[in-house]
A protein has these predicted regions:
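Short gly/ser-rich loop at a beta-strand->alpha-helix junction or flexible surface loop bordering the NTP-binding
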Residues: 1-155, 164-168
Length: 169
């Protein structure tokens, strides 16, 4: 992987971290960030025709009554398995790479979803965020959610240890 590509991913992560920390400071409770923000955080490709606003922080909750009003934050109900991470220096929780992939299923074509998944299994150790087993396990233990069938359909097109997602399509 070129140094330029790595710097781009690091820059995207830094920008997302700033936006999400800012949103978390305005929140009165824990903020679980996912969707397009998590994709940027992990350096995954963003679907070309994704309808999610790039100007908002997208957070997920388990039920509609847990949504809150926070300026610049859009809450989504996600019924999949909760798999989150948090770094000590961050003020927000973020969806794991595999959970983010599952969340993006309803906003991606099959090809785009496979590209997102493959990018998370990169040959480059600095970019590798998940293994094929991680995806299989997540779908196995996760309850039904919107996009679950598309996730199963994308699995055969996702190859581990590739240099770039387009190698898979």
């Amino acid at each position: 992987m070129s140094s330029f590509m790595h710097e781009d991913i690091v820059g995207r992560r830094r920008a997302e971290r700033e936006r999400c920390n800012d949103a978390a400071r305005r929140s009165k409770g824990p903020l679980l960030v996912g969707y397009i923000n998590a994709a940027n955080y992990y350096g995954a490709p963003i679907p070309r025709h994704c309808t999610l606003s790039v100007d908002a922080v997208h957070a997920c909750v388990s039920s509609a009554n847990k949504r809150r009003r926070i300026k610049g934050v859009v809450f989504h109900v996600f019924k999949g398995k909760l798999d989150i991470r948090k770094k000590d220096y961050e003020q927000f929780w973020i969806a794991s790479p595999v959970m983010m992939w599952a969340q993006m299923a309803q906003y991606s074509t099959l090809e785009e979803l496979a590209a997102i998944g493959a990018s998370l299994m990169s040959r480059d150790k600095r970019r590798r965020m998940a293994t094929r087993k991680d995806f299989d396990t997540y779908l196995e233990i996760s309850p039904r959610f919107i996009g679950r069938n598309k996730c199963h359909e994308a699995l055969p097109y996702m190859t581990e240890n590739t240099d770039s997602p387009p190698e898979n399509t």
